[in-house]
Amino acid sequence: MSWLFPLAKSASSSAAGSPAGLTSLQQQKQRLIESLRNSHSSIAEIQKDVEYRLPFTVNNLTININILLPPQFPQEKPVISVYPPIRHHLMDSQGLYVTSPLVSNFTMHSDLGKIIQSLLDEFWKNPPVLAPTSTTFPYLYSNPGGMPPYPSQGFPFLPPYPPPEANRNITSLSVADTVSSSTTSYTAAKPVAPSFGILSSLPLPVPTTESSASVNQNGFGYKMPDIPDAFPELSELSVSQLTDMNEQEEVLLEQFLMLPQLKQIITDKEDLVKNIEELARKNLLLEHSLEGKRQTVLDKYELLLQMKSTFEKKMQRQHELSESCSASALQARLKVAAHEAEEESDNIAEDFLEGKTEIDDFLNSFKEKRTICHCRRAKEEKLHQVIAMHSQFHAPL
């Protein structure tokens, strides 16, 4: 009961407050620790003057910064690590320890609070990502496998939809226009075949390479008729007729038109054009239905964006509440509350010693404040033991 004896109290307080009781190294260490506490109110003391922990959240990722002070601190630089391991240019290859120049070049006169603040600013400017081999952080909505929960890119499942063309009329289009428009819309630009009279209206031969296989997969393949190696009809012609055929294109084309293979190709072409026109008409009938479904998809996509934004805000709020209710934060609050109750009890004792309060009032109020102080300290110590025991086998609380 030193508070009952003013001389003993004043002597003990002067001895404790005298800087002569601490070495210059210890005084500098205490100043750096106070700088750290003043700069970051949410920091938690894991072990007095040895280990501190600062949780923070960036991009829905909660990270703990662990600050370990070696025995010869501040002559030795502090060891700053993070959990879970992250990928960042200020971290080592394993993503555990901070390799910032401010930490590497730490001296006795460095400001530890400003160093941690600069580290947080850099994390906010360039957000880190979880290391691929790291375990998930023990929160309810932690993203598995270290994958970011919300990618910043958009939703690529909606292809651009071309505006409908007005006054489209399939019957008014010629075959050449239909083929040219289809080629322009769905394939790359190809060299135009040379025009030689009636040959320009004939279909191009279907290639037999990989492009032919891809066309067949879509159900639009066409097999060319077999071309014979010899034409018996030409053996009946004279040399002069063959010469005229070689020199005159019209005669050569007439001979070609008599070939059964070419007649089959022309017939197949006409059938194919009719099928294309019929399919185009059916597609036009589906235009209004597709427009309605497209608008429905766009409306649902807009609703999805709104729900995504609301979910992200709630997730951020959940992480903030989770941090405020974490074991480290509760321990820090209990410590502050116990210190406040102790100061209030000391003030009550000083008022009693100065004769400002009666003994009955003093006993009631002092006993109440002291009981609160000891209860809070006991809870704080018990919580510290639970955190220390849990950190040995599990992730930090």
Curated annotation (Swiss-Prot):
Q: Which GO terms describe its cellular component?
A: centrosome; cytosol; ESCRT I complex; late endosome membrane; nucleoplasm
Listed as disulfide-bonded, the cysteine pairs are: none
**InterPro entries documented for this protein:** ESCRT_assembly_dom, Helix_hairpin_bin_sf, Mod_r, UBQ-conjugating_enzyme/RWD
Q: Where does the protein end up?
A: Late endosome membrane; Nucleus
State the membrane topology: Peripheral membrane protein
Provide the positions where the record notes the PTM Phosphoserine: 18
Q: Name one Pfam family in it.
A: Mod_r
Say which family it is in. Answer: Belongs to the VPS37 family.
**Complexes and interactors:** Component of the ESCRT-I complex (endosomal sorting complex required for transport I) which consists of TSG101, VPS28, a VPS37 protein (VPS37A to -D) and MVB12A or MVB12B in a 1:1:1:1 stoichiometry. Interacts with TSG101, VPS28 and HGS. Component of an ESCRT-I complex (endosomal sorting complex required for transport I) which consists of TSG101, VPS28, VPS37A and UBAP1 in a 1:1:1:1 stoichiometry.
Q: What is this protein called?
A: Vacuolar protein sorting-associated protein 37A
